Amino acid sequence: MRQQENFLESMQSFFPLAATLLGYLIGSLSFAVIVSRVMGLNDPRTFGSKNPGATNVLRSGSKTAAIVTLLLDAAKGWLPVMLVRWYGKPYGMEEGTMALVGLAAFIGHLYPVFFNFAGGKGVATALGVLLGLSPILALATGATWLIMAYFFRYVSLASLTAAVFVPVYYVFGDGMAWYLSKGVLAALCAMSLLLIYRHAENISRLIKGTESRLGKKARTERKS
């Protein structure tokens, strides 16, 4: 009986770890690179900001490729969280594990094992994670991004502002839209800090006034 209890306890530790690893591997799929290859576009790591993300794919001149990249990058943040939500409870995985798995997917996008750990900045993937954790939180964050992008035309500034407000929204929404979880808050803070860190060069360009505005295309559009 005691051995059976020990086995069950060890399995309860194994499942969250396995889910976290799976989340990281899903996050490591760099769809900006994959979609660009499939659609015959230049590698987004070779032009514009050299960032493998939807915004830089848009600079290639293909709106379709950018939209597909955006949706897939968001989906890879959303899916691991939802898998835990749908199937995790019998295995001891609840809200804290969902946040951990989402963070792992986000880190996978930033440092993808399949692409030499050279990834994007994680904005779309972070939004997908938020959508899995709380659609209301994702809506508030997305609205913040849209407002900033519309008025200032800087994707990076919109992303940075949204990142700062994510944990703020989560704290102030406690007791109204959700009940605060320290594990979720820690994951959100970690995502926000990592996203800001990945935008260090953008911050420098914003200060210097040399940051590219939304809609600016790269010179090279398609493979020759």
Swiss-Prot record:
Q: Which reaction does it catalyse?
A: an acyl phosphate + sn-glycerol 3-phosphate = a 1-acyl-sn-glycero-3-phosphate + phosphate
UniProt cross-references to Pfam families, sorted A to Z: G3P_acyltransf (PF02660)
Q: Which UniProt keywords apply?
A: Cell inner membrane, Cell membrane, Lipid biosynthesis, Lipid metabolism, Membrane, Phospholipid biosynthesis, Phospholipid metabolism, Transferase, Transmembrane, Transmembrane helix
Example of a GO cellular component annotation carried by this entry: plasma membrane
Q: What is its EC number?
A: 2.3.1.275
Q: Where are the transmembrane segments?
A: 14-34, 64-84, 98-118, 127-147, 160-180
List the membrane topology term(s): Multi-pass membrane protein
GO MF term set: acyl-phosphate glycerol-3-phosphate acyltransferase activity
- Tell me the route in metabolism or biology where this protein functions: Lipid metabolism; phospholipid metabolism
Q: Which GO terms describe its biological process?
A: phospholipid biosynthetic process
Please state where this protein is localized: Cell inner membrane
Looking up InterPro entries in the UniProt record yields: G3P_acylTferase_PlsY
Q: What is its main location?
A: membrane
The answer on whether this UniProt entry bears the keyword DNA damage reads: no
Q: What PANTHER family does the entry give?
A: GLYCEROL-3-PHOSPHATE ACYLTRANSFERASE-RELATED, INNER MEMBRANE PROTEIN YGIH
Question: Per its database record, what is this protein's job?
Answer: Catalyzes the transfer of an acyl group from acyl-phosphate (acyl-PO(4)) to glycerol-3-phosphate (G3P) to form lysophosphatidic acid (LPA). This enzyme utilizes acyl-phosphate as fatty acyl donor, but not acyl-CoA or acyl-ACP.
The UniProt family comment states: Belongs to the PlsY family.
Query: What quaternary structure, including any partners, is listed in this protein's UniProt entry?
Result: Probably interacts with PlsX.
This chain belongs to the protein called: Glycerol-3-phosphate acyltransferase
Q: What is the lineage of its organism?
A: Bacteria, Pseudomonadati, Pseudomonadota, Betaproteobacteria, Burkholderiales
